[in-house]
Amino acid sequence: MAERLSLSRWDEWFDLGSWQNPRLLHAEPSDRILVCPPALGDGYYQNIFLEDNITLVILDYRLHDDLVFDMAGERERIEFEFQLAGPQAGYSFFVPYFGLPEMSVKHARKRYFKIEVFFEPPILNTYFQAVL
């Protein structure tokens, strides 16, 4: 049976973690580290702030049960996602966010390991002005 979570942000189902977690490949004190609650699964979410309006995210987790996420909607930004393990391993995605409500399903006992790069609007505006 799937558990359903209603969230305002995708990452709010994680608990606060430490940058000194030995499972992390590399971490700095400025990184934001979140860990999967033991009741839901095992793993982490690492948020690395590269520069203003550019963030690198590393996710590596496995769930005990299926989870359904209902989200109010992410703020406007774009994401490049690279799947390293899990159901979509080897694939990459471009995901634009427009602030619209979303629904996502994550399956139990599958490893989700991916890298995400997020670009926020101010840097996007500069880029699109240069391109046009």
Each predicted region: which residue ranges?
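N-terminal regulatory/effector-sensing and dimerization cores
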Residues: L34-L132
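Short Lys/Arg-enriched alpha/beta "domain-start" segment
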Residues: M1-C36
